[in-house]
Amino acid sequence: MQKKNFYKILILFVIFFFQQNSFASIFEGIPRVVDGDSLEINDNKIRLFGIDAPEKKQICKKPYLIISFLSFQKKYECGLLATNQLKKLINNKTVKCISESKDRYNRYLSICYLKNKDINSWLVKNGYAVAYKRYSKKYILEEQHAKKNKLGIWQGTFQNPEEW
């Protein structure tokens, strides 16, 4: 009889534990843009899931003069550009972020939306971030689009943000 009760309690505990961890956290509000892939809404630190933007102080290169087979490149602050483009996109509007987990820095890993627009997708598709393939395959097509069309960081050379 005690063994039966033990298993019932164990099963209830397991069900309760997994239910607690399966619900998504939803954050809604006007965010503070921390950098090209991080936001803060009401003191909740949010990391945009599945993407990696250049770091704030990261420098990239883009062509400024092409003569026949020669290409001259100039440096630019691609990390600051990614941050500013995210600020410009959000433009003090309400954002909704849906998170199912946290990263090692205790930030919510989230897909964020401006109305119905996936912000994470927009950043990758326009070349302000790369698909973070180590953690997700979700934004690979958007990255291929940006690369093919030489948008954002794909117009020149850059060090992958993960390696910077």
Model-derived segments and spans:
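Small beta-barrel nucleic-acid-binding modules, primarily SNase/OB-fold domains
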Residues: 2-164
